[in-house]
């Protein structure tokens, strides 16, 4: 609210400079021209601040129009904002690839995820969670699943022979998601040790979730994981294998960034990455085409330093 209040104050100051003092001038004198002048005035502000202030003043124009105090063309306001204002810079998605690869290496041996306890029932729950967590994280890394998509995945969605699943993804659209051999193998191992629970569920296997809850609330029932559970799994295993400082920096969505970046580095093909990540807009995929400092250093060395006579021996 403070940002909107500040935006309106700056607008009033701009009007005064244009000899249109809000305290003494009838509101009927206000036109889209003054909005355009305000956009020009905001060029000295940061793009993010500019957008906040423009939204505030645009809202005021629309309110005045609704109250029939002035006549405003909404389409004209939109055109002015689009043509003359600046957009805030887009942050490059951060993909800590090395950290994720370290994590994936650590969980390759499922025994690393299992802690020993004397109680047989607790030990079975720990084992189930270990196999599930490994399969879940490998699936995120190798498929580009959004966390809610992975949680909704059912056994009947899978084509085990061909290594893919057919899902209803973002925008309620049907999509094919491909699996690696390692992620498929991890899922099969997890489902194998879960077989008794699945068989006693009283439901058709095809209707059961791939990734199930294994907590007190679920008991021996097969209930699908929630996105919150998915995020908790990643947090727990990141802390276990990488340390507390990376908790929150590596999330289920970070695995999706890793997936897209891996495709681009492996193929250099933007269209492949877009299709496999199921991005509607290729501009989203383009955000992942940045190079790391290591890659730039290597390219620079190859061009300028590799055969240089000036290089120290």
What are these regions (language model features)?
Residues 1-313:
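Conserved catalytic core of the tyrosine transesterase superfamily
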